[in-house]
Amino acid sequence: MRLSMIRILLAEDDAAMRQYLERALERAGYAVTGVDRGTAALPLLETERFDLLLTDIVMPEMDGIELAQRAGAIAPDMRVMFITGFAAVTLKAGKAVPQAKVLSKPFHLRDLVLEVDRLFDIGSASGLN
């Protein structure tokens, strides 16, 4: 199955939200590795290959924007998607990592899966704007 080869690194400090997102993405056929902070993601990025970094922006120790910038230096071909509940940080993220997608909370899990599918041109989302 094509989807099983797509690996997502999920950085989300809220444990319930992280588990919720992991389950939804795994049900959609993605391989997901979850971490609770940006500083926990960096060692994984150095030793494993991921296709997508899905990260909250507001996290302790290292925010998602800094994580995405550091990740870009380690794995320049990896795609980035931010998830955030703060409108002001959405603007900051867009300027700091312009090629990244930003999904604002609250969002429906179906919307998250569709956005991830769209990044990889999978399924019915293929070719849609």
Where would I find each of the regions flagged by the language model?
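Conserved acidic carboxylate
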Residues: 12
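Charged docking surfaces used in two-component/phosphorelay signaling
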Residues: 19-27
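Non-catalytic signal-transmission and effector/linker regions of two-component phosphorelay proteins
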Residues: 1-9, 110-129
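Short hydrophobic/Thr-rich beta-strand motif most characteristic of the beta2 strand and flanking loop
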Residues: 29-36, 44
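Acidic catalytic/metal-coordinating carboxylates
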Residues: 36-40, 63-67
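Active-site residues of response regulator receiver
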Residues: 56
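Receiver (REC) domain active-site loop signature in two-component systems and cognate sites
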Residues: 59
